[in-house]
Curated annotation (Swiss-Prot):
Name this polypeptide is given: Fusion glycoprotein F0
Origin organism lineage: Viruses, Riboviria, Orthornavirae, Negarnaviricota, Haploviricotina
Main localisation: virion
Record topological domains on the Cytoplasmic side: 522-553
Record topology, Extracellular segments: 32-500
Membrane topology: Single-pass type I membrane protein; Single-pass membrane protein
Length: 553
């Protein structure tokens, strides 16, 4: 097979609006209808919205690790806070040193700068081999160097506040939000309450909360000790550090509530540490999140195939795993450039492939145009759930209904069985019990048969077998040809020359002429003989009449 042509749409951010506008001009058709396909073993499992993105937006979170205690409670919390600070410094000092080495590597110009830059990266990696992702992270760290310096310039004002979250904008090139998860705890427990607590209880509460936060910090930075500055922080780690205050930054960066959960599940929101100051216990993290463009008229439809029964054995439909539909146009979608969530696809670019007319006709409901491959084995799961109902191949497995009791049989030639709550309430398949709540209405096609002409060979073993049969047929044909050649070799070539053939034809023509003349002569003689016989008979009858007349006289 040759390479298939594809439709490639590069996705720089400046083209997002143009693509969205172009697609919005196309009339939106209904989703791919799976009702006529289910009985043919092709199941539409769901749709997802298609989005394009580029990681272009950044913002900074300044995590205030050390909380400010109320003046009247500082003495009570002094001991646990000092222990917390010592542990915190021990845990995060490797991170700060790694960040500082990489940022200082750009102080030299020219080729030496490049060598120092790579050397700083390799010095931060345990095995001495820097991956492309780590070099990219280090480059981002260098770019954030000025922003980190600006944040450190404001560290006194950041550490002095008792607010759990507030914007830091003075002299910064990007949005920065100072958050303090521990400060939030202190405010909730001590600053914003009139309840009087004794010193022992304050010490215990602060100590327990600090230990819990240290555990979270260890969870975040523990796996990064080997290369602390070069590993991205996940959204979960960011929430562990910042608490619920993380939402404030995301909202400021333009992430809507309807999009937030989907983006969190995609893993596209990440963070990179850009500074750690042990004196003030400030941790700076640059957060990167995507700029997303939604293609309103484009959706991705997911297809699954079920092993069906045919007269040639079990087979599966040859259809794409994912197709995309815009208006009446359906093409195969390459999802290798996309990140999937439960409801969305986030793609850096959109790559589609045109489908053959047969597959296009098949997906539009013409099941007689669907092609099947005998590649599914007998151990393939012969059933699939769909919206509270079951599509099963009851020839491959026993479909036992527990309520009402009975065995569901599959008619001869029927590809699969559609089982819903009207035919069985509780279904048992291979020891798995399912309670059915859905139904297949009258719009679902049933009793579909797969013709022999629709089943083709695509598996490697089957193709090898077919090639073996073809080779045997060719060998037999060659044997027949050799036998024919041997017989032809015995023919006298002189007898088959041109002059001999002309002579044979001439003699044959003369023989035919003689034969025809002989036949005409024979017919003439027979006719003449019959005429003579008639004359003699007339003469005889006439003579006899005369003799009788003479006798009477």
């Amino acid at each position: 097979m040759g390479p298939r042509s594809s439709t490639r749409i590069p996705i720089p951010l400046m083209l997002t609006i143009r693509i969205a506008l172009a697609l919005s001009c196309v009339h939106l058709a209904s989703s791919l209808d799976g009702r006529p396909l289910a009985a043919a073993g092709i199941v539409v499992t769901g749709d997802k919205a298609v989005n394009i993105y580029t990681s272009s937006q950044t913002g900074s979170i300044i995590v205030k690790l050390h909380p400010n205690m109320p003046k009247d409670k500082e003495a009570c919390a002094k001991a646990p806070l000092e222990a917390y600070n010592r542990t915190l410094t021990t845990l995060l000092t490797p991170l700060g040193d790694s960040i500082r080495r990489i940022q200082e590597s750009v102080t030299t110009s020219g080729g030496r700068r490049q060598k120092r830059f790579i050397g700083a990266i390799i010095g931060s990696v345990a095995l001495g081999v820097a991956t492309a992702a780590q070099i990219t992270a280090a480059s981002a760290l260098i770019q954030a160097n000025q922003n980190a310096a600006n944040i450190l310039r404001l560290k006194e004002s950041i550490t002095a506040t008792i607010e759990a979250v507030h914007e830091v904008t003075d002299g910064l090139s990007q949005l920065a939000v100072a958050v303090g998860k521990m400060q939030q705890f202190v405010n909730d427990q001590f600053n914003n309450t009139a309840q009087e607590l004794d010193c022992i209880k304050i010490t215990q509460q602060v100590g327990v909360e600090l230990n819990l936060y240290l555990t979270e910090l260890t969870t975040v930075f523990g796996p990064q000790i080997t290369s602390p500055a070069l590993t991205q922080l996940t959204i979960q780690a960011l929430y562990n550090l910042a608490g619920g205050n993380m939402d404030y930054l995301l909202t400021k960066l333009g992430v809507g509530n309807n999009q937030l959960s989907s983006l969190i599940g995609s893993g596209l929101i990440t963070g990179n540490p850009i500074l750690y100051d042990s004196q003030t216990q400030l941790l700076g993290i640059q957060v990167t999140l995507p700029s997303v463009g939604n293609l309103n008229n484009m959706r991705a439809t997911y297809l699954e195939t079920l092993s069906v029964s045919t007269t040639k054995g079990f087979a599966s439909a040859l259809v794409p795993k994912v197709v995309t539909q815009v208006g009446s146009v359906i093409e195969e979608l390459d999802t290798s450039y996309c990140i999937e969530t439960d409801l969305d696809l986030y793609c850096t670019r959109i790559v589609t492939f045109p489908m053959s007319p047969g597959i296009y006709s098949c997906l539009n409901g013409n099941t007689s145009a669907c092609m099947y491959s005998k590649t599914e084995g007998a151990l393939t799961t012969p059933y699939m759930t769909l919206k509270g109902s079951v599509i099963a191949n009851c020839k491959m497995t026993t479909c036992r209904c527990a309520d009402p009791p009975g065995i569901i049989s599959q008619n001869y030639g029927e590809a699969v069985s559609l089982i819903d709550r009207h035919s069985c309430n509780v279904l048992s398949l291979d020891g798995i019990t399912l309670r059915l709540s859905g139904e297949f209405d009258a719009t679902y096609q049933k009793n579909i048969s797969i013709l022999d002409s629709q089943v083709i060979v695509t598996g490697n073993l089957d193709i090898s077998t077919e090639l073996g049969n073809v080779n045997n047929s060719i060998s037999n044909a060659l044997d027949k040809l050799e036998e024919s050649n041997s017989k032809l070799d015995k023919v006298n070539v002189k007898l088959t020359s041109t002059s001999a053939l002309i002579t044979y034809i001439a003699l044959t023509a003369i023989s035919l002429v003689c034969g025809i003349l002989s036949l005409v002569l024979a017919c003439y003689l027979m006719y003449k003989q019959k005429a003579q016989q008639k004359t003699l008979l007339w003469l005889g009858n006439n003579t006899l009449g005369q003799m009788r007349a003479t006798t009477k006289m």
